[in-house]
Amino acid sequence: MSSLSKEAVLVHEALVARGLETPMRAPVQEIDNETRKRLITGHMTEIMQLLNLDLSDDSLMETPHRIAKMYVDEIFSGLDYSRFPKITVIENKMKVDEMVTVRDITLTSTCEHHFVTIDGKATVAYIPKDAVIGLSKINRIVQFFAQRPQVQERLTQQILIALQTLLGTSNVAVSIDAVHYCVKARGIRDATSATTTTSLGGLFKSSQNTRQEFLRAVRHHN
């Protein structure tokens, strides 16, 4: 991982140490993204042919390539740590010691069990210690970890650990409220249920007042 940013390496190592990294095998050989897309295109062609779809139809002929490009460049791009957002933490010169909360962070992820959509919003809060982070960077970290096959519980914890690692403080809290299309569009076909997951660290876990302040922000968001 020598070509990766220091921040990407630190976050990846922290997740591995806690058993919270997305299950990924070591590649048999390194391949570039264009080769990856070409191989996925071939496999998607086979899948569509097995479904008796006519790939000579002008509506379908480019679908295998579109899916491959979508997988590599978009919805699974968070598997590639070379795409980890550029993060600059700033010295906390103003000595901010109150909660900083970002609400209504939109996220779209993919259920790793059925490869269908997870659609939701996140609320993220932290109490600065020695460093603060640009607010948009929190959104980018949420989006990075959402862009991979996921389960919501792990996604919530990955965001927490990433921010704790980058900010040098355990005082981080994350809550996600999302609709799972593996529930909405198949199986039970429940169109109205949503799933909420919360991960708390530091004062958010040990202090009832701090925890309640965060949960009030989450309820306001909902």
From Swiss-Prot:
One of its GO terms (molecular function) is GTP cyclohydrolase I activity. Pathway: Cofactor biosynthesis; 7,8-dihydroneopterin triphosphate biosynthesis; 7,8-dihydroneopterin triphosphate from GTP: step 1/1. GO terms for biological process: one-carbon metabolic process; tetrahydrobiopterin biosynthetic process; tetrahydrofolate biosynthetic process. Keywords: GTP-binding, Hydrolase, Metal-binding, Nucleotide-binding, One-carbon metabolism, Zinc. Pfam families: GTP_cyclohydroI. GO terms for cellular component: cytoplasm. Zn(2+) binds at C111, H114, C182. It catalyses: GTP + H2O = 7,8-dihydroneopterin 3'-triphosphate + formate + H(+). Its EC number is 3.5.4.16. NCBIfam families: folE, PRK09347.1-1, PRK09347.1-3. Belongs to the GTP cyclohydrolase I family. Homomer. PANTHER family: GTP CYCLOHYDROLASE 1, GTP CYCLOHYDROLASE I. This is GTP cyclohydrolase 1. It comes from Klebsiella pneumoniae (strain 342).
